[in-house]
Amino acid sequence: IKYYLRLGMAYLKKIALMIGITFCISLSHATPASNIFNTTFSILSYAKWETNSPKLCVINNSGLIADFKRNAPTHSNYRIQPISVNEIANSHCQILFFSNLSAKDEQSILNNHVNFPALSISNNNIECENGSAFCLYRKNQGYAFKINMDSLTQSQVHIDPRVLLLAKSSESAE
């Protein structure tokens, strides 16, 4: 009898371990990224760039530059620089990061200053109904994002459609 009890306990431990591993794996896929920089670079990994070193321009907020550089993926070739709204038209930035403008201002800038392919990302546009193509927002202990399909189309940057699944996953993560 003791043999069968030990065998049963070992079996139960294995089942509990497998359930725990499965639970942890599912959480790792659904948990939002921990900061705006990781979330931004995760999104950018789904983009197809016409250059090997895309230019990421932070609009009107040079204080974020050091954090973007520190959080950039190890083998990335992003050229990260601050620019003002007045410099956008001549910047030819492939990525525009907005952090302190309204959605209305973002949309105006995209319509009036950007006449080249550029992907726009904002962490100050929670509704994401106009303005940037990708809108980051705080969710629980991390960040999630929404996608504005009109702005994404306007960006003229090819994005792998799997990013839509990532957005849906980040939206539904508890």
Residue ranges and their predicted role:
Residues Y4-A16:
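Bacterial N-terminal signal peptides that target proteins for export
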Residues A10-K13, H29-E174:
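Short hydrophobic alpha-helices and adjacent helix-cap/hinge residues
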Residues M18-C24:
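Bacterial N-terminal signal peptides
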